[in-house]
């Protein structure tokens, strides 16, 4: 197979460098990279063991980057979950659907769809929301509580800038959370209703 090259131009030299860092992380020395300011050249050498496969992976990375970083059609970015997780500094593993919930509470549109976080929040805002949720979720791990209670408390604490224990007490006080037979805190209503009611109460407090 002959050498394949792709030339790209980014909005800034910093954005170009960030993209090359991603390419290096994902593809290593299977891609030869050159940067000149905001311009980038990517080369798949013909000596590659799987040049066609590497070229396809590179095109996929470029597509994911563009969907996530460029001005969106209809006001919605499509952030690749893979790209998002590679950029986030997580305290603990998190359910990504909770990040969508947090963005919604912050006033953004957000949903998970086929490997993408579709939202009108830009990439940096999505990364920040994931990190905020992860930090609060880590604090809930000491609670004697069911997983959904921890998730709910972390989402609300991150959305409204409240301590986790304060949020838990508010949930208990409103009857949305109760103590189960085994002593663990459990939801008294379904998760969606609890999130809606609690966000209304905490948002107006």
Model feature map: region roles:
Residues 49-67, 125-141, 195-205:
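Charge-rich, low-aromatic oligomerization/scaffolding segments with amphipathic character
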Residues 90-102, 157-174:
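Short amphipathic alpha-helical interaction segments
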Residues 101-108, 123-162:
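Short amphipathic alpha-helical interface segments
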Residues 114-121, 180-199:
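Accessory beta->alpha helical hairpin/"wing" motif in late/C-terminal subdomains of nucleic-acid enzymes
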């Amino acid at each position: 197979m002959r050498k394949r090259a792709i030339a790209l131009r980014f909005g800034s030299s910093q954005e170009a460098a960030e993209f090359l860092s991603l390419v290096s992380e994902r593809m290593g020395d299977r891609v030869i990279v050159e940067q000149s300011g905001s311009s980038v050249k990517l080369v798949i050498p013909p000596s590659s063991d799987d040049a066609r496969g590497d070229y396809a992976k590179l095109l996929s990375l470029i597509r994911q980057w563009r969907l996530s970083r460029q001005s969106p059609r209809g006001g919605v970015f499509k952030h690749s979950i893979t790209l998002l997780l590679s950029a986030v500094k997580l305290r603990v593993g998190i359910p990504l659907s909770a990040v969508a919930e947090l963005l919604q509470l912050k006033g953004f549109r957000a949903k998970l769809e086929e490997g993408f976080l579709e939202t009108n929040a830009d990439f940096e805002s999505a990364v920040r929301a994931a990190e905020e949720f992860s930090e609060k979720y880590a604090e809930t791990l000491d609670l004697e509580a069911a997983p959904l209670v921890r998730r709910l408390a972390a989402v609300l604490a991150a959305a409204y800038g409240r301590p986790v224990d304060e949020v838990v007490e508010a949930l208990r006080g409103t009857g949305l959370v109760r103590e189960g037979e085994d002593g663990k805190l459990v939801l008294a209503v379904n998760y969606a209703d609890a999130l809606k009611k609690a966000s209304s109460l905490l948002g107006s407090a």
